[in-house]
């Protein structure tokens, strides 16, 4: 009935002032930060402003307390696939405490804008300036990262109120030198490519949730040392999050 997701890629050893480590395209990062999210609210497609709805989330040590807030793009085609089937579907991005207020300031200043502004008579794109200044501050070639994913689904099991939880915390691989972000994105793509080659996915193009069988996909993740934890909990009442 209600599905809540949290995820993020973070440095294992955060360095001030930004407590972040760039592990993919900075253009992709600012796209997520600057663009509205698309969620399901009351069963309907709903556009939500980025850099809003700040909350605190607790994880087991050594992760600890993190911030979570709205950014764009995290759900891809899921809202359209599950419109009318779920009441709530949302995804929040995880960052270290104190990150939100800094990022919100960049957003409010317009530093992620793509519209040129005049500086000493010269048109300048604020986002290009931000990329040039910010990227060196969050680039750590020797740094080690982690990827965190948590999903909470609220509904019923055998007619009784229940919650299903899925959690993954993956770390930089010292043996291969792969970052956690590389592991999570690269292995996922490779697994699906193999499944396509074996004829285990339907032909055509659609959202991954329609095309990839979850059971076999999870088994392939386990072969690559991803530790996905799943649990089902009976709860009292019929509340939301």
Spans of features found by a protein language model:
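C-terminal catalytic/substrate-binding lobe primarily of soluble NAD(P)-dependent oxidoreductases
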Residues: 2-241
């Amino acid at each position: 009935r209600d599905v809540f997701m949290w995820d993020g890629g973070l440095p294992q050893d955060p360095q001030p002032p930004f407590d972040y480590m760039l592990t993919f395209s900075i253009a992709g990062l600012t796209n997520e930060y600057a663009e509205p999210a698309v969620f399901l609210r009351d069963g309907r497609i709903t556009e939500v402003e980025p850099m809003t709805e700040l909350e605190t989330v607790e994880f087991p040590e050594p992760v600890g307390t993190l911030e979570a807030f709205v950014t764009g793009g995290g759900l891809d085609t899921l809202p359209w696939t599950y419109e009318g089937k779920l009441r709530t579907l949302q995804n929040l991005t995880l960052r270290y405490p104190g990150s939100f207020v800094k990022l919100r300031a960049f957003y409010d200043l317009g530093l992620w804008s793509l519209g040129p502004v005049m500086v000493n008579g010269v048109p300048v794109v604020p986002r290009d300036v931000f990329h040039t200044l910010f990227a060196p501050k969050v680039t750590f070639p020797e740094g080690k990262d982690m990827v965190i994913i948590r999903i909470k689904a609220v509904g019923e099991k055998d007619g009784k109120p229940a919650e299903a939880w899925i959690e993954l915390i993956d770390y930089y691989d010292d043996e291969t030198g792969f970052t956690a972000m590389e592991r999570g994105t690269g292995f996922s793509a490779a697994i699906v490519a193999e499944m396509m080659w074996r004829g285990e996915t339907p032909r055509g193009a659609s959202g991954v949730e329609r095309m990839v069988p979850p059971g076999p996909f999870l088994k392939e993740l386990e072969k690559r040392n991803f530790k996905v934890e799943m649990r089902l909990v009976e709860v009292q009442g019929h509340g939301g999050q």
